[in-house]
Amino acid sequence: MREHFNDGVEFARFLAHRFVTDKAPNSAAALTYTTLFAVVPMMTVMFSMLSLIPAFHGMGESIQTFIFRNFVPSAGEAVETYLKSFTTQARHLTWVGVVFLAVTAFTMLVTIEKAFNEIWRVRQPRRGVGRFLLYWAILSLGPLLLGAGFAVTTYITSLSLLHGPDALPGAETLLGLMPLAFSVAAFTLLYSAVPNARVPVRHALMGGVFTAVLFEAAKTLFGLYVSLFPGYQLIYGAFATVPIFLLWIYLSWMIVLFGAVLVCNLSSSRLWRRRSLPKLIVLLGVLRVFHQRQQLGQSLRLTHLHRAGWLLPEDEWEELLDFLEKEQFVCRAGGGEWVLCRDLGAYSLHRLLNRCPWPMPSRERMPANLDEAWYPPFQQAMERLQVEQEALFGKSLAHWLADGTSGAKVT
């Protein structure tokens, strides 16, 4: 039990480190800024799509009220009034204004995908037609699916089985959980569809549940803070709603991005527990696997490394690929696979050590045993090198910097 608790604490620390390393707070700030300008265009597009189907007529206002009632703290009521007014006015824009709104909505989706791709360490974002079709599907089919789901929900809640004396036991509790279920579905879809990477549905669902629960807790705590500490109203007066709403948007994006970090690292949850090896040793091990597959005429992907015993997480694999591609060791073979495109017989280890951006490991960091045929001679060579370095440079700085002259000579 204690071991599981310690593992959970270590994994939480690992996620927090990745959250900061991936610059998620900066991405949340950028998304907050984009959301401020894109919320009205997104709502306008949603209303326009729903108005195309007579059965969904008037559904947009109901959905908007539902969203603000269940996903925004009570301090957002004034903002809801303003947004409704802005959205109503936006429906009377000319085609130039409509194009501007569409571009603004697309900009928000681009910013979201960029933040997610940075978390997933995606080397190649979506381009061209693929990106356009995804965004268009979100802007067109998204509101229609939302409207259909809301219509079905409205019908279900009107049944006598959920209201009145004939209501089923626990029906009221079930209805109260519907906003949470909507949140889980939305976050699951977001985590599975937006990153340009393969995301297991199970991991996306786990992240959706985690983010939805954390979102509900944050909404409750944020509402308590606003009601118990109204000092911001004394400072901002009539404009107090605006900074509070911006703060909530920023907090919401922080939660969403932390959920993305969780989903990304669920697939490597068993890898973070391993004792980290020096990057230079990992690099040599990866080159060894590349060399073996080159001799067999085969390409390489991350799963092949895992089978060979090198349990690299996605971000470390991408970091190594950046160096290997820059040094023209490997080339892309398509389908996420890579091939060795350099003759290792014409490339010395000394040259690699000079070009490698990672330092040579000390004796303390060198693993005592490694199930690789090349490792024992490499370990012995590294130990001899460090002994010779200590013999050459082991004297004190005072010895090296002492001189008997008054000035330095440059030759």
Curated annotation (Swiss-Prot):
The keyword Signal does not apply. Keywords: Cell inner membrane, Cell membrane, Membrane, Transmembrane, Transmembrane helix. The chain crosses the membrane at residues 36-56, 92-112, 132-152, 174-194, 207-229, 244-264. GO terms for cellular component: plasma membrane. It is found in: Cell inner membrane. Its main location: membrane. The keyword S-adenosyl-L-methionine does not apply. It comes from the Bacteria. Belongs to the UPF0761 family. HAMAP family: UPF0761. PANTHER family: INNER MEMBRANE PROTEIN YHJD, UPF0761 MEMBRANE PROTEIN YIHY. This is UPF0761 membrane protein PA14_51960. It comes from Pseudomonas aeruginosa (strain UCBPP-PA14). The lineage of its organism: Bacteria, Pseudomonadati, Pseudomonadota, Gammaproteobacteria, Pseudomonadales.
